[in-house]
């Protein structure tokens, strides 16, 4: 699903990512560990096409993210460290917007309802995002990443700033998504 070969990123003379290589297969969960400034977020931004690399290659399902970003991004669900939320929209307005943006072909109403149920935001789906707690905003961010059933899910610090209960509530849908993908392969 993901194949990274000698991926690097420089900012002037500062090397942020130095020739990282790895592969991640279907239904595999990987994590990047390291101190602040180690290049974890930079690597994820390169994998998702939000940042170009200085060298190397990143393939998403065999498609080079730099050579054909539109095709590669169709298979990616991404939750950046700061969720890209439109605070003046309701949760459902926002998810419908993301659905349209991703040109999702799944049945709209049932697909979005399933995602809301999975990340436990059904009860706040009519509320304006600005008025939600940090935990709910994070769940909405995860929901937008799940729209379209992406084959690759990239989450950048999805639990930062959450309390222990909220962390468990975020991890549960991620694990469920992983298991569901694994069951599909059987």
Which ranges hold each PLM region?
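Walker A (P-loop) phosphate-binding loop of ABC-type ATPase nucleotide-binding domains
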Residues: 35-39
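Conserved ABC transporter NBD signature motif
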Residues: 56-67, 71-72
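Conserved ABC ATPase "signature" region
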Residues: 96, 100-124
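Conserved catalytic motifs of ABC-family nucleotide-binding domains
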Residues: 149
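Catalytic Walker B motif of ABC-type/P-loop ATPase nucleotide-binding domains
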Residues: 153-157, 162
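Single conserved hydrophobic/aromatic residue that forms the stacking wall/gate
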Residues: 178-186
């Amino acid at each position: 699903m993901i194949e990274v070969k000698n991926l690097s990123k420089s900012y002037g003379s500062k090397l942020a990512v130095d020739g990282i290589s790895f592969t991640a297969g279907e239904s595999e969960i990987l994590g990047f560990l390291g101190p602040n400034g180690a290049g974890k977020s930079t690597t994820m931004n390169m994998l998702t096409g939000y940042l170009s690399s200085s060298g190397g290659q990143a393939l998403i399902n065999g498609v080079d993210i730099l050579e054909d970003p539109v095709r590669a991004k169709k298979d990616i669900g991404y939750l950046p460290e700061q969720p890209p939320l439109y605070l003046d929209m309701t949760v459902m307005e926002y998810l419908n917007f993301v659905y349209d943006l991703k040109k999702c072909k799944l049945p709209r109403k049932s697909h979005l309802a399933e995602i809301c149920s999975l990340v436990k935001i059904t009860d706040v789906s009519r509320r304006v995002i600005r008025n939600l707690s940090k935990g709910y905003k994070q769940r909405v961010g995860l929901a937008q990443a799940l729209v379209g059933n992406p084959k690759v899910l990239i989450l950048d610090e999805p639990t930062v700033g959450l309390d222990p209960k909220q962390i468990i509530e975020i991890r549960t849908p991620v694990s469920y998504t992983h298991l569901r993908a694994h069951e599909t392969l059987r």
